[in-house]
């Protein structure tokens, strides 16, 4: 099977790259092994929240120079500040066109409310999630936080207690409460099934919206704004928007323990748009190995296509990190399993020395979290010290940074994905 581009990985990086290439007339296939990290995410997209020295970032454009000095191996440092900001703005345009429902701007980070009542800096958040700008108070006074009776993945009292400690919410009266929703009783009897996905399915299929709206109104009497767990609308925000339109107060939703409906909604929209553009999703397939000629990849063998390998002019490795088996750790080494790409090595981290992978303090950032493949300024992948001509990397499979520590994981995904799409299009005259 022949394509212009074969992409390994159907997460945020893979789909963003695939959409950008399909829009430029390329014929793309995505080899997708299963659920992506997006399905477990909060739905917010971080560009850069913190520098390696611990300094918090409000304006990303002012922080990129410091990032390059402190961490020259970071993908942003390799791409350059101008390109990073341009690709971030390009993704904002893509998100608006696809109606991903994201709010925020590359001009300045905002803070989103976390499920535990904290505030976390981020770049883009679902517009249904409560957020505050730096040094500004939350614009409402009376907040009611409503959980669902028997649903333990969202704790209104804990959220309320912690939120009261935040200066931006010091002026607010915050009350916790619960919704009963009798139609969920059959799920309550099966605690393993009482999760956000199953709740959302039941609410959309079996619950009378009028009775649900009435219960929310009664439980939130006197409130200016109501916080709900993100269980109202599985594949889109439409059901949540219907509830919002029928009530007299503002509704916001907060992500729950995984699986996350907020990230899953975005994943569905991206995947469906990629397929509408003519892209091919090879779901349930897994890349196994590749065949090379010099510095070029010529064939990709997958679990389903072992006898008839995939062939393409260019290949994109967007397989993610350890979570999705884009990287594999054994006792003596960390490696990339499909192409055998070189793994980033730093002063603190050696992929072949197990004792450098962790630090003594469990809660501290761990060196192994910065593991990933080596790329150049074009996002081409290195193997045995030489860069491939037609193999690129995007997203968490790239090494040299800790996305959790720096608050940049999803930003790296979209910035590198759009960079790769540009490189491939320019090379082939697209």
Curated annotation (Swiss-Prot):
Top-rank lineage group of the source organism: Bacteria
Pathway: Polyol metabolism; glycerol degradation via glycerol kinase pathway; glycerone phosphate from sn-glycerol 3-phosphate (anaerobic route): step 1/1
Alphabetical keyword list: Flavoprotein, FMN, Oxidoreductase
Species name: Actinobacillus succinogenes (strain ATCC 55618 / DSM 22257 / CCUG 43843 / 130Z)
Organism phylogeny: Bacteria, Pseudomonadati, Pseudomonadota, Gammaproteobacteria, Pasteurellales
Record-level GO cellular component terms: glycerol-3-phosphate dehydrogenase (FAD) complex
Chemical reaction(s) catalysed: a quinone + sn-glycerol 3-phosphate = dihydroxyacetone phosphate + a quinol
Any Pfam family matching the protein: FAD_binding_2
UniProt entry tagged with the keyword Oxidoreductase: yes
Any one Gene Ontology molecular-function term assigned to this protein's record: glycerol-3-phosphate dehydrogenase (quinone) activity
Family statement drawn from the similarity comment of this UniProt entry: Belongs to the anaerobic G-3-P dehydrogenase subunit B family.
GO terms, biological process: glycerol catabolic process
Name of the gene: glpB
Cofactor(s) required for function per UniProt: FMN
Annotated protein name in UniProt: Anaerobic glycerol-3-phosphate dehydrogenase subunit B
The keyword Chaperone belongs to this UniProt entry's keyword annotation: no
Function: Conversion of glycerol 3-phosphate to dihydroxyacetone. Uses fumarate or nitrate as electron acceptor.
EC numbers on record: 1.1.5.3
Subunit structure: Composed of a catalytic GlpA/B dimer and of membrane bound GlpC.
